[in-house]
């Protein structure tokens, strides 16, 4: 990716123009973004990846969030300065979307998708350092939040993800560092 053209993304021999550069601002084109997202989805998740028309409304909201279109976000009641909580039934593609969408803005800081249960397993092995590691820095999307077990380290029980989210909320208040999550819970 050339920094002079962050709206043009090269995947193999194909170039995807997601919008137009006007001055120092990118005017994104949602249909072009969908074309790119489907192509990138096939590269990341396999040839059967498909964006369905019924998913376009949520994709539009997520796209304007990720491209930081403050005006469009305001119109539909999204606060682009807060994190995303994406909920839905098992297998509907929440994790795939949170892994896919950052690719439309490769010039921005990217979050790391981490399964919440893996964090709890790490806590069981390594203890409270894990809460510190995830609670004090980094840009994360916690995947499948709410289905992880209670952590236990040397006989001491802990709601690991609850503690991490409290720490990350403090981080948000102090440094405006956003946290994303996916969940199957209502």
Descriptions of predicted regions:
Residues 91-94:
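Conserved glycine(s) of the Walker
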Residues 97, 101:
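Hydrophobic positions on the alpha1 helix immediately C-terminal to the Walker A/P-loop
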């Amino acid at each position: 990716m050339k920094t002079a053209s962050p709206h043009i993304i090269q995947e193999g021999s194909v170039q995807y123009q997601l919008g137009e550069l006007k001055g120092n601002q990118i005017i994104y084109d949602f249909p072009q973004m969908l074309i790119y997202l489907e192509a990138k989805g096939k590269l990341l998740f396999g040839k059967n990846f498909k964006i369905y028309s019924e998913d376009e409304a949520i994709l539009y909201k997520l796209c304007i969030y990720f491209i930081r279109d403050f005006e469009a976000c305001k119109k539909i009641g999204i606060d682009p300065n807060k994190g995303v909580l994406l909920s839905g039934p098992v297998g509907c593609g929440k994790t795939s979307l949170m892994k896919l969408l950052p690719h439309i803005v490769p010039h921005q800081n990217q979050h790391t998708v981490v399964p919440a249960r893996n964090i709890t397993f790490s806590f069981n092995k390594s203890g409270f350092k894990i809460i510190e590691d995830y609670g004090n820095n980094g840009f994360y999307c916690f995947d499948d939040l709410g289905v992880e077990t209670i952590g236990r380290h040397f006989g001491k029980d802990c709601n690991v993800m609850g503690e991490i989210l409290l720490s990350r909320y403090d981080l948000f208040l102090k440094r405006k560092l956003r946290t994303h999550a996916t969940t199957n819970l209502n």
